[in-house]
Amino acid sequence: DCQREDGGMPHTAPNPYTAGGGPHWCGFIIPASWQTYVNYGDMRLMERYYPVMQKWLGYAESYQVDGLLKQWPNTEYRGWYLGDWVPPMGINPQDPASIDIVNNCFLSDCYGMVAKIAKVLGKEVDIPEYQQKQEALKTRIHEVFFDAENRRYASSSQIDMIYPMLVGATPSSLMADVKDALFEESAGRFNGHIATGLVGISILTQWATQNQEAEYVYGMLKKRTYPGYLYMIDNGATLTWEEWDGERSQLHNCYNAIGSWFIQALAGITPDEAAPGYRHFYVRPQLVKG
């Protein structure tokens, strides 16, 4: 109901005023619909909002330059153009390269999900279009943002390094090198801590779960110093904060994506997309030391 004629979406719904966010906010209708289907077997959101998804993707494409999504304008209903949101101090969420790689990886993932949705809905004619767009964008992401000499993407933050691997933009021949570089950055630059914001936590946990990297996540979760979940608890938090230092909201959903890691990685319970609603699922616990 909130979608504009040109396909633009607000960052919140209902939309009584100009709210801040970025592509992850207004494009959420795509992963939300897909994950509802995968986890509950409920197709209704996909059926109802498939045309909305298509229209929004067209809107995003209208702001592509040389094959990459670039900043769209603020409007009376939507402000800002975020990549990640509220990472720890010392990480610049306004770094243009970081914003661009995060948002283009998200768009690439959206193409892939819409192709899957089209298959489920029997819209076979649409599938090649979205698959081709996804492959082209993945290629462009790697071409533009990868520094071959240093084996790093964009600003080399955790989300910048992980997201291209998660969406398949990183060639398989370079995957081991990029992963090693990620671990180097995490251990050195970030002193073994989680170093992402709202968007990055979900990306980090998805990648770690898929790649059996439970020790990597667990090592960061054990840290009691800033930034981290135990730091929140040790400083009186009973719910997750909006920022790692607790400066803003004390009741927020910014970092809640870590919850899925306990279920899907530690317990190892993951759905089978081919049998949605847990009609068939996998149990593959990823045990950690300590």
Residue ranges and their predicted role:
Residues D1-H11, N39-N103, V120-Y163, K223, ...:
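Active-site acid/base region of carbohydrate-active enzymes
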Residues P14-C26, V86-F106, E143-M161, V167-A169, ...:
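Solvent-exposed loop and edge beta-strand segments that line ligand/cofactor-binding
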Residues Q132, E215-G290:
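Non-catalytic C-terminal accessory modules of carbohydrate-active enzymes
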Residues G22-I29, M46, M53, D100, ...:
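Active-site-proximal structural scaffolding
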Residues L174-F183:
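Alpha-helical repeat scaffolds
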Residues S62, A115, H142-E143, E184-A187, ...:
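Amphipathic alpha-helical segments of tetratricopeptide repeats
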